[in-house]
Amino acid sequence: MFRVTGTLSAASSPAVAAASFSAALRLSITPTLAIASPPHLRWFSKFSRQFLGGRISSLRPRIPSPCPIRLSGFPALKMRASFSSGSSGSSASREILVQHLLVKNNDVELFAELQKKFLDGEEMSDLAAEYSICPSKKDGGILGWVKLGQMVPEFEEAAFKAELNQVVRCRTQFGLHLLQVLSEREPVKDIQVEELHSKMQDPVFMDEAQLIDVREPNEIEIASLPGFKVFPLRQFGTWAPDITSKLNPEKDTFVLCKVGGRSMQVANWLQSQGFKSVYNITGGIQAYSLKVDPSIPTY
């Protein structure tokens, strides 16, 4: 017999439940460039303060164990897709795209019914939209891209040990979850200016890599590097909406600014748009001038 050991303090309606989540937990993981982020990413930023843990400093990353979480009283879930090698990567750096649905801890029969519906072929997004009490229901249960340390421990443990497209279950203080990992990626990488300089000596690299400079035109008049296309951060609204017509998400993309801060913002945003291999140039053009080429002016 399945026994409920926790309760959900939220009210029974989804709207009130969402408000209770917000009051219960606090965490600020707001994407700096939310202006043109996809809807599920804009929502994820908001929901991070509701569902994904208390204070990020209080959550210790946990290395997943080999087997999925099991709630006693339910049969094992079957796979909806073939296994991949997703969980064999570095959990510390890995980011996953998570979809889930949530019901209250005492809705055991509904949870079993939803599990059966899923196994019978119904889509997780449809089930989440109709039955989930999580605010993500309006996005089909999509939570967005998350990494270790951003979620409550029970949910994190289940999500980060799940294979791609495998559906697993877990229980948190908010209720019972069916969750699925839809995709995975490595975070934005840093590249030192010395390594960048070495790469730039290779004509093949200069031909194939995407080099973008997010500084303002007046800055670029003072100092610039060859091969970099200009995408000023202050003009984000003009070039961001159709960025994939200007840059290829499949290619290596290197982002430059003065000291590395603005470039990291844009690099993270590019990754959120599906760019697979994004590098932030550490220290920016100022570091390039100091460490590689003193002929580049500093300002």
Curated annotation (Swiss-Prot):
GO molecular function: peptidyl-prolyl cis-trans isomerase activity
Domain of life: Eukaryota
The keyword Transferase appears for this protein: no
Active site, UniProt feature: 257 (cysteine persulfide intermediate)
PpiC domain residues: 93-183
Alphabetic keyword roster: Acetylation, Chloroplast, Plastid, Transit peptide
Annotated protein name in UniProt: Rhodanese-like/PpiC domain-containing protein 12, chloroplastic
The organism of origin for this protein: Arabidopsis thaliana
Organism placement in taxonomy: Eukaryota, Viridiplantae, Streptophyta, Embryophyta, Tracheophyta
